[in-house]
């Protein structure tokens, strides 16, 4: 009878379950932006979900300059401290939610710039999108950004949250008051982030973990 070796993804080092780190990125950086209000809502839902350790990251506070590294990100030969710090931040994550506006039928410059700084740090991590805007609810920006993240071997989810005419959902304190569709969509996206992050764990594991 043939004997089979243990599959590499069955290694205890790979299969050990830990709470995944979910990073929620606020893409908009302009004064008067709606992004923090939308992000605060999905942050609360992610915490209540209980499937993650959740981090909220505001690109306005990260304040990356326009991409200024002399070497290709694939080399990881970073020369600037802001790049090294950004690399360390993104390396912590197992999954992402990008909270994005739509500018002129596309995504905003700050999120593209933040993505372009790195390469390996994004690989094999799922990403969900919470988009907002006017009649199109930011969906065109989300669809365009999916083309970018797949190039970096990220896994964009089918499940998304799309918020049309976002101002109508803000109260006097600029807190987002979601409707039932938004709440249901958020739960579905968070559930899928947990499943997909777990499935991709073996690909994120270092080579040493696969051969131990």
Where is each model-derived feature located?
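N-terminal beta1-alpha1-beta2 submodule of the flavodoxin-like/Rossmannoid cofactor-binding fold
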Residues: 5, 9-100, 105-113, 176-187, ...
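A generic structural signal for secondary-structure junctions
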Residues: 71-72, 119, 150-153, 198
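Rossmann-fold NAD(P) dinucleotide-binding segment
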Residues: 108-124
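Short, glycine-/small-residue-rich phosphate/pyrophosphate-handling segment
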Residues: 123-167, 180-185
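Mobile beta-alpha loop/short-helix "lid" or hinge segments that flank ligand
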Residues: 55-66, 120, 152-173
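A short small-residue
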Residues: 18-24, 124-126, 164-173
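Alpha-helical structural signal in soluble globular domains
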Residues: 41-49, 117, 121, 148-151
